[in-house]
Amino acid sequence: MSNKEDILKKYRSNIHERFEMPDLSDITPITYKEPLSQFIEMSKNVGGNIIEVKENQDINALVKELYPDAKEIASNLSEITIATRNPDTIENAQALNGTDVGIIRGMLGVAENGCIWIPQQMKEKAVCFISENIVILL
């Protein structure tokens, strides 16, 4: 038996009372007629600024337009050609200090609260926190 199996066996043997899963059929999920509009509204309510990029619009030019004074831009996304730092190739997280704009990719926007799921797809996730401004491509 593996160490994991030993741990799980000990854990299961110490469960004194077992409960059935509750019936969730009475719960009605929240739905929105216009989920994108709801996401944009909620994001603005919590301090975000949503910009819908047109199909052929250059993201690099848009970032330069939005942040004209930005000198240090960090991103590991292949479509971002204006990045001066790559969070995958720096020696340590401290090297991201002084980043004006961090550009990352979000995977899922939540209409209910304007949150965005951002998986760690970079070596140094500090870019998400240390940047003065963050651009999330969704």
Model-derived segments and spans:
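The feature marks the mature, well-folded catalytic cores of soluble enzymes
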Residues: 1-138
